[in-house]
């Protein structure tokens, strides 16, 4: 892995985020990935940030709460195999299965975090949690709740 200037890749990160990218975690010997399609890159407190929202009920949330770190994998080329893997990972919990192994994805050690990168999706953002906040579902407009939270999941 090599370090990159995130701002050079920002258009690609934002384009791919709308289609779905991966958040990866590792806690002890348990790794997990989750598909996300909302997030943002920005600057807070003079630090480069990647912000995403992960609900309490998700295994990924538990992993991040325990480790305070994660990686984000962004496809440079969205091949049919990568698209299929991202869809599969987004449709199952990793609590009892190894979604990455099921998709034949190869884990690569992070440089500054213990959470893995994915060899087949080499554009990786390494992230450490420095701030978290509860999302107030009741403040989300009704039309967005209906569209993005149809199951009324906490």
Where do the language-model regions lie?
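Active-site-proximal mixed secondary-structure blocks
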Residues: 1-36, 40-154
